[in-house]
């Protein structure tokens, strides 16, 4: 049965419609049996932070465990920018399309550009900088990217190095949304890793919600200039979780023995198995995604038939074709 009470043979709806991996639930059960100080000052959170610092090879990184992706983006971006400053992102970026104007609600404009495969490049950013050169317009200050992207594509090491160098040369901050960073780092063809991402960005987050956790994202701030006083803003935004051990226990379990990457690799493998079968059946994919996100174009009639039997997310409808987004865990 799906969440609406109808019979569903297989659900491809998303990678976060179930609870959590059993090992994370076990870690939570064990942690909940003890008494803990609140607001992320517990031993589980301290252990998780140490593990993440080790994984990203940044012992001085500031690590904050938060509940969800929109919350993490809002807190990070609003903290990093002055009131007159803006974000540059692709037009399909999550902060520009699926976060209900959360960034704009903090007073920061999101400047969007169309991009091939949903990836930003220096060539796309230069015109934005040229158009915003004085105090009569917002000042571009932060470049927002995601890996994997909204269409499941990946940044290569060379692309991220070029983008990072451009940002540093132009006094721009580089922030990476890692809601599906696990899927990106374990996908076929990927040549990035956590230490490289940490070295090339000012801040990024590691997504747990869409990678087997009950909830949770780990915000990693590498740039020391962006680190002071963030807990004040987290509290002010209502995001300082009283039962912080709920996040700490999960991220400790994810990073103690490689479970984070194990779960991501499994999701990718299942998605590629699905993709191979659908390609053999003649399906048309709108994106060449090596991750657990797969996008398929079908007719309106096919869409209706599929929706009756399977849980599948609809991404959009264009000229009698419906784009279905299928995700595997």
Positions of the model-derived regions?
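Hydrophobic beta-strand scaffold residues
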Residues: 87, 110-111, 174-176, 285, ...
């Amino acid at each position: 049965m799906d969440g609406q009470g109808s019979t569903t043979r297989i659900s491809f709806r998303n990678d976060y419609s179930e609870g959590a991996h059993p090992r994370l639930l076990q870690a939570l059960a064990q942690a909940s049996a003890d008494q803990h100080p609140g607001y992320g000052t517990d031993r589980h959170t301290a252990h998780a932070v140490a593990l993440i610092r080790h994984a990203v090879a940044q012992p001085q990184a500031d690590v904050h465990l938060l509940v969800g992706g929109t919350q993490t983006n809002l807190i990070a971006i609003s903290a990093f920018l002055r009131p007159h400053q803006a974000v540059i992102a692709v037009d399909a970026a999550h902060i520009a399309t699926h976060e209900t104007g959360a960034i704009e609600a903090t007073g920061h404009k999101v400047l969007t550009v169309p991009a091939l495969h949903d990836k930003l490049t220096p060539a796309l950013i230069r015109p934005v900088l040229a158009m915003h050169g004085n105090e009569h317009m917002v000042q571009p200050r932060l470049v927002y990217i995601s890996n994997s992207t909204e269409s499941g594509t990946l940044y290569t090491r060379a692309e991220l190095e070029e983008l990072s160098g451009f940002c540093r040369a132009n006094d721009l901050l580089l922030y990476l949304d890692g809601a599906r960073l696990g899927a990106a780092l374990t996908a076929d063809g990927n040549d990035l890793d956590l230490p490289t991402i940490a070295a090339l960005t000012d801040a990024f987050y590691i997504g747990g919600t869409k990678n087997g956790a009950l909830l949770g994202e780990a915000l990693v701030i590498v740039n020391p200039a962006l680190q002071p006083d963030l807990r004040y803003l987290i509290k002010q935004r209502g995001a300082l979780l009283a039962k912080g051990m709920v996040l700490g226990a999960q991220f400790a379990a994810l990073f103690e023995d490689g479970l984070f990457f194990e779960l991501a690799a499994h999701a990718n493998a299942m998605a590629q198995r699905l993709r191979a079968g659908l390609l053999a059946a003649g399906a048309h994919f709108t994106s060449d995604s090596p991750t657990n996100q797969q996008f398929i174009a079908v007719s309106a009639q096919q869409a209706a038939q599929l929706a009756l039997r399977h849980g599948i997310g609809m991404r959009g409808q264009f000229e009698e074709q419906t784009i279905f987004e299928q995700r595997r865990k």
